[in-house]
């Protein structure tokens, strides 16, 4: 039982005994005692002044005396104005540590068959280019969010919608057809997504050259864009694709398959995956159908040019296009189609979309539309909106080929981690295979942690060099501390020390040890908070705080050299439980922790 729960129950009993009043649990407010005061937990007594009919200090004094006499968890108390600071007994902290120790997955709540089903969409790549730094933030946030939502007792389905059709895909296809000379991933030794991305860049270069030529002949930019033969060919290819032209469809399938093989490799390296992948080419027709259904029911209206719109002025928004006059769909139509397929596949209770903040308006509209069309989760859909990510050099663009590819970034992170680890002697005495594995764990851990520690809503600059520092709020610092604890546990085992299932009470704990148990115990509340706020950064920053506190403890106290055997065993057990919570916390973020370094 949590210490707070015990104290709340005792305070309720005390108020009844002292003042003859029953109070609800929510009226009893406990918080961590501020660092400048003595104690662990503080009770705010102001809500009880009416019933005590006394001043705040006297009321606090009376409640404190009652708790000291009747609640074994309270060892001492002091009163500062209307605040009652409670010092918790050492035996109670050891009891709490035993509870944590007995649960291998402390702080995580298992789902049952009847738990709510939450679907989380993330990644959403286009099949005309490789994944880039923006996708890295999206994938890492989506994967961590899925883990956190699952750790709060929900069933989770991780899903991806692949944008595999449209004019941007036709640009890569046309460029390959015109300039590719039959190149394949096999013939070039390139990953398929990178090869197709090269042709997207190639289209853009040829198109720009064409525009420059037409403008030299006296055309305006708009006229040149309308007259561009290359763009006309791309549009014709899209029309043929929509009409199911066998040659265009065969080229589309071949190039998309190259891209999927490349994506799979990137996802595998990144450590993310999906339970179900949807493709826009399968969903856009479903969306059209649903829009026509809404038109018949009078939810939507048609303009003279045949386009279909929805009027959202009553909801404080404007008119929104759902189908163009020529019958082609827009993103909104496709999202409606995808929702229809998903709802047919799964009994969704909640849908979370992990999409950048430039789409905030889109999801406001989508929520209203899905609700109008009868999707039960429409109104409550969650747009997990996140900010842009940049490198210190500035923004990224993919049309000009100056984008930061996810593959290159991950490779650079692993090689930098290897160099840094070697310089600091972290790889000494390891085989080549072990050293490579640690470089991978540290490099990817640095990347993931640096991105996930930032509040998702904020724009951020990813600094590769800063992220691989073994000191400060970084992945490698946390990983190194975990490896350090594993080394302590190995040495303890080698010297024949066995951690008992129950650590016996009877030892006096220092303030630092009590604080560390309190921090480890907080993990359960942190996981809950991260789930309620949809915030991986809460887990990341808590894990850093825990590791920072443990490192101070490690420097200030003897563990293996402690002479008192009972204290030594307690400190080893405390270390093991810190390591467990670090492993669980980093696991929720999708980050591995090495057992040696």
From Swiss-Prot:
Known catalytic reactions: tRNA(Arg) + L-arginine + ATP = L-arginyl-tRNA(Arg) + AMP + diphosphate
Name of the protein: Arginine--tRNA ligase
Tell me the GO BP annotations in alphabetical order.
arginyl-tRNA aminoacylation
Write the Enzyme Commission number(s) for this entry: 6.1.1.19
Write out the residue ranges of the motif 'HIGH' region: 125-135
**Keywords tagged on the record:** Aminoacyl-tRNA synthetase, ATP-binding, Cytoplasm, Ligase, Nucleotide-binding, Protein biosynthesis
What PANTHER family does the record tag this protein with?
ARGININE--TRNA LIGASE, CYTOPLASMIC, ARGINYL-TRNA SYNTHETASE
Pfam families per the UniProt record, alphabetical: Arg_tRNA_synt_N, DALR_1, tRNA-synt_1d
Methyltransferase in keyword set: no
Predominant location category: cytoplasm
UniProt lists the family membership as follows: Belongs to the class-I aminoacyl-tRNA synthetase family.
What is the scientific name of the source organism? Bacteroides thetaiotaomicron (strain ATCC 29148 / DSM 2079 / JCM 5827 / CCUG 10774 / NCTC 10582 / VPI-5482 / E50)
**Location(s), subcellular:** Cytoplasm
């Amino acid at each position: 039982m949590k210490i707070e729960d015990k104290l709340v129950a005792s305070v309720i009993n005390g108020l009844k005994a002292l003042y003859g009043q029953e109070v609800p649990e929510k009226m009893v407010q406990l918080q961590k005692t501020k660092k400048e005061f003595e104690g662990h937990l503080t009770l705010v007594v102001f809500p009880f002044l009416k019933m005590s009919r006394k001043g705040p200090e006297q009321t606090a004094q009376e409640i404190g005396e009652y708790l000291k006499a009747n609640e074994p968890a309270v060892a001492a108390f002091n009163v500062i104005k209307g605040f009652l600071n409670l010092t918790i007994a050492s035996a109670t902290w050891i009891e709490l540590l035993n509870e944590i120790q007995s649960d291998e997955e402390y702080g995580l709540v298992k789902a049952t068959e009847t738990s709510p089903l939450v679907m989380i969409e993330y990644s959403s790549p286009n099949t005309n280019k490789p994944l880039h730094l923006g996708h890295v933030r999206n994938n890492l946030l989506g994967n961590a969010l899925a883990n956190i939502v699952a750790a709060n007792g929900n069933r989770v389905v991780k899903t991806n919608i692949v944008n595999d059709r449209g004019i941007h895909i036709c640009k890569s296809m046309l460029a390959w057809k015109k300039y590719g000379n039959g190149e394949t991933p096999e013939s070039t030794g390139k990953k398929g997504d990178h090869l197709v991305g090269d042709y997207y860049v190639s289209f853009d270069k040829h198109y720009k050259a064409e525009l420059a030529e037409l403008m030299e002949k006296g055309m305006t930019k708009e006229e040149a864009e309308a007259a561009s033969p290359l763009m006309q060919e791309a549009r014709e290819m899209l029309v043929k694709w929509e009409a199911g032209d066998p040659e265009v469809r065969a080229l589309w399938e071949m190039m998309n398959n190259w891209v999927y093989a490349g994506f799979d490799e990137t996802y595998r390296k990144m450590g993310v995956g999906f339970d179900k992948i949807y493709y826009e080419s399968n969903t856009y027709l479903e969306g059209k159908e649903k829009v026509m259904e809404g038109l018949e029911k009078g939810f939507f209206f048609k303009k003279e040019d045949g386009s279909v719109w929805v009027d959202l002025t009553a909801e404080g928004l404007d008119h929104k296009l759902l189908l163009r006059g020529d019958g082609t769909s827009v993103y909104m139509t496709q999202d409606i189609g995808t929702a229809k397929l998903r709802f047919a596949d799964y009994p969704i209770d909640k849908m979370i979309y992990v999409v950048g903040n430039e789409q905030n308006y889109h999801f406001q509209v989508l929520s209203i539309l899905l609700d109008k069309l009868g999707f039960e989760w429409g109104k409550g859909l969650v747009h997990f909106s996140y900010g842009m990510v940049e490198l210190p050099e500035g923004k990224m663009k993919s049309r000009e080929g100056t984008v930061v590819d996810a593959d290159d970034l991950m490779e650079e992170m692993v090689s930098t981690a290897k160099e840094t680890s070697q310089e600091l002697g972290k790889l000494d005495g390891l085989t080549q295979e072990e050293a490579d594995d640690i470089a991978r764990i540290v490099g990817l851990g640095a990347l993931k942690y640096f991105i996930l520690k930032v509040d998702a809503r904020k724009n951020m600059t990813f600094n590769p060099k800063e992220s691989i520092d073994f000191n400060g709020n970084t992945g490698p610092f946390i990983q190194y501390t975990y490896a350090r604890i594993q080394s302590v546990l190995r040495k303890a085992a080698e010297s024949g020390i066995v951690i008992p299932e129950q650590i016996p009470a009877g030892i006096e704990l220092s303030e630092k040890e009590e604080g560390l148990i309190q921090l480890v115990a907080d993990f359960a509340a942190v996981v809950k908070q991260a789930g309620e706020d949809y915030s991986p950064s809460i887990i990341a920053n808590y894990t850093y705080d825990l590791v920072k506190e443990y490192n101070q403890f490690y420097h200030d106290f003897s563990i293996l050299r402690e002479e008192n055997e009972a204290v030594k065993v307690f400190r080893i057990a405390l270390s093991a439980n810190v390591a467990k919570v670090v492993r669980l916390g980093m696991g929720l973020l999708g980050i591995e922790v090495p057992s040696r370094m």
